[in-house]
Amino acid sequence: RPFLVKEEKILLLAQEAEKDSEMLLALKQIINNCTYEKVEVEKLPMFDLEYIFLQIRAKSVGEVVDLKLLCEDDGETYADVQVNLDEVDVEFTEGHSNSIQLTDEVGIIMSYPQINMMDLSSNSGTENVFGIIKNSINQITEGETVYERADFTEKDINEFLDSLTTGHFELIQEFFETMPRIRHEVKFKNPKTKK
């Protein structure tokens, strides 16, 4: 169903709070309300939740959003741009995989970050990143043996991550950098310079 005044209020209150944790809570609550809790918000990756939210917003308020975007050529002028939300989609990076081979014998299978992983706001930036990485490890493989995340304690996972080389860690970072994301390219000209 589309947004009602109730959902608009939730969104406005979250915007006023200016906290990521409040925005995430609002996103979760709005999707739950508008889908009659038929979507398992806690289990979906963030990019799917963002896409669902955009679709609900498009059907509720309208498909076209008016934005003011900073012009790159002078870094100070803003241009009025319209974006059709029906044209916004989830972008998948070619070659992306959730399977990361760290060595000839050891690999990890990752899951995509979910909304409950993103609300680690009480932690510092570094702790937040490591928290998301730890929570995204789904399996660890050693040869033909597969170990489930549930088989490891928090201490085991911390020790595993601490034992990785910089190269291994870069492979994990690449997983996050290339994972699917909401993206839409908009072409516009600076109203002052016409570039």
Where are the model-predicted features located?
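Short, surface-exposed, charged amphipathic helix/loop patches that serve as local interaction elements
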Residues: 1-195
